[in-house]
């Protein structure tokens, strides 16, 4: 299934005209490189305001999430919640999508608004502490295995607060591909990718800047077929793969 099917779905529902500016993107530039989409698990455009379905959107660390203005918007936890905690205070809005299959293809739009960048946030991840894309004003990088290994990076793809990002991620076995509109395409192969974390929020996840907000839109998640694309065995060899580097966290192990 092509990402353009999202646009076709929105047209058929008559909601294109009321969608936020994050839809001003050519989804045709984001098509699966590795996997073949199968059954749709989640298609969400957040057209109705209100509370979120907790079985689909799992708020983390007491942070607050609701559908507003055509997006899923996340805020930090309340001052009362933070005062009651000794750790995991919820200073940054965090959410996970537990309906994400173990192997998947997922397309989504997101942005981080306000707040402060730190060494940890903001990020998007796939599996809790399994595969994480960290956004920084110095560039963006991909870290895996409990953030111990940096396996991809781009100095040119810098974090811009308030900017909408559009991504397509694919995971099958120990292989992962993620691509961004007007950004990098990364391929990673690591054994940790095939192992779900036994704790925390699994599936697609996001964490915003400290004391800031996260906005999410245009979420489409599919199960995938058992076979990969015919072109994949050759295509995987075309990626420029960096030699993994231990992070500060990895060096302490």
Language-model segments: residues:
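Short tryptophan-centered beta-strand motifs in secreted/extracellular beta-sheet-rich domains
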Residues: 46, 106-108, 163-180
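Extracellular beta-strand elements of beta-rich domains used
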Residues: 46, 217-221
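Extracellular glycan-recognition surfaces and repeat-rich motifs
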Residues: 50-80, 249-250
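Secretory/extracellular carbohydrate-interaction modules
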Residues: 76-143
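Short, aromatic/His-centered strand-loop micro-motif at the edge of beta-sheets
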Residues: 145-166
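Flexible glycan-contacting loops in extracellular carbohydrate-active proteins
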Residues: 188-218
């Amino acid at each position: 299934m092509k990402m353009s099917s999202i646009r076709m779905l929105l047209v058929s529902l008559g909601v294109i005209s009321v969608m936020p500016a994050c839809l001003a993107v050519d989804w045709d530039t984001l098509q699966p490189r590795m996997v073949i989409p199968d059954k749709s698990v989640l298609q969400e455009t957040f057209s109705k305001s209100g509370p979120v379905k907790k079985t689909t959107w799992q708020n983390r660390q007491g942070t607050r999430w609701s559908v507003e203005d055509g997006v899923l918007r996340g805020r930090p936890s309340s001052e009362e919640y933070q005062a009651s905690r000794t750790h995991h205070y919820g200073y940054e809005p965090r959410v996970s999508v537990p309906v994400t299959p173990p192997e998947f293809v997922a397309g989504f739009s997101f942005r981080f608004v306000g707040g402060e960048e730190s060494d940890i946030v903001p990020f998007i991840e796939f599996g809790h502490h399994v595969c994480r894309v960290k956004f920084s004003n110095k560039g963006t990088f991909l870290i895996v295995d409990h953030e111990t290994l940096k396996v991809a990076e781009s100095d040119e793809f810098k974090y811009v607060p308030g900017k909408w990002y559009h991504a397509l991620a694919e995971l099958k076995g120990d292989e992962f591909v993620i691509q961004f509109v007007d950004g990098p395409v990364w391929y990673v192969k690591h054994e940790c990718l095939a192992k779900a974390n036994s704790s925390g929020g699994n599936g697609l996840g996001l964490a915003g800047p400290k004391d800031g907000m996260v906005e999410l839109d245009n979420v489409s998640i599919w199960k995938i077929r058992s076979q990969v694309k015919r072109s994949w065995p050759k295509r995987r060899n075309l990626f420029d793969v960096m030699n993994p580097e231990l992070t500060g966290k990895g060096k302490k192990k």
